[in-house]
Amino acid sequence: MRRNRSNIEFSSRLPKKSFLCPAKVIELEKIKVGAVSYLNTKPLLYGMQNEQFLQTHELVLDYPAHIGEALKQGIVDVGLVPAALLPSFEQSFIVSDYGIAADFDVASVCLFSEVPLEKIETIYLDYQSRSSAALLKILMREFWGIQPALVETKDEGFRTKITGTAAALVIGDRAFEQRRLSTYVYDLAAEWRGFTGLPFVFAVWVSLKPMSPEWIEQFNAANAAGMDYLEEIAEAQKYSAFNLRTYFQHHIAYRLTEERLKGLERFLELLKVY
């Protein structure tokens, strides 16, 4: 059994005998799957938005921080959870070989400002993010050596405050729009890679109880289904703010390889410090 220090089990790699879920949960109730409502999840959800999958599953879409809370409260059974939330669960299981990661620049998780890093005095934190905010704090203190004031936000108005020495962390699809407006753009995944030499994992599929090996196999297949249709999925979005074909194929990494899991483990280690 593979386990890290935060009581997180990598279920898709455990022996089959370790997955003993009550049959009634699988057979009598739909499994509620919470996913992020950003463009980068479209390829993962491609294989879940069909009649066969939806006969036994219900999809719940929201932004990252809400999905984590929904999992804690039992509103969903499985969630695409921000990596920074993993230590907050008493016990959790990573139940898929797929997630949201970046090997180099991610393009959609950036610090935007009108001045260079060393001149930033205030940073407004995107209210939709947990992992990205945690990553920003690690970069600030461990690598950049800056200590601006950090301000929590509650609505979309925070982006209007990017002026003078005030910057903002913006994630998701809105980051593509902000890239056209701001003078300085610091890609957090690229910065992480530059300092650690590792990919960064933003989100993983998590459950709070073991899932059966049969379900995990089915769920992995659903995640994998869209990987052969990235161009078609990109074109179907009719999105003009960023080249989604490039985004899906070169910026976002969906498979949780060993190297990407090493990046996740390194991030979780630093979370304990910061």
Where are these regions (language model features)?
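Cationic, low-complexity basic patches in intrinsically disordered or flexible, solvent-exposed regions
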Residues: 10
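Domain-level signature for soluble enzymes in the chorismate/prephenate branch of the shikimate pathway
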Residues: 2-3, 16-274
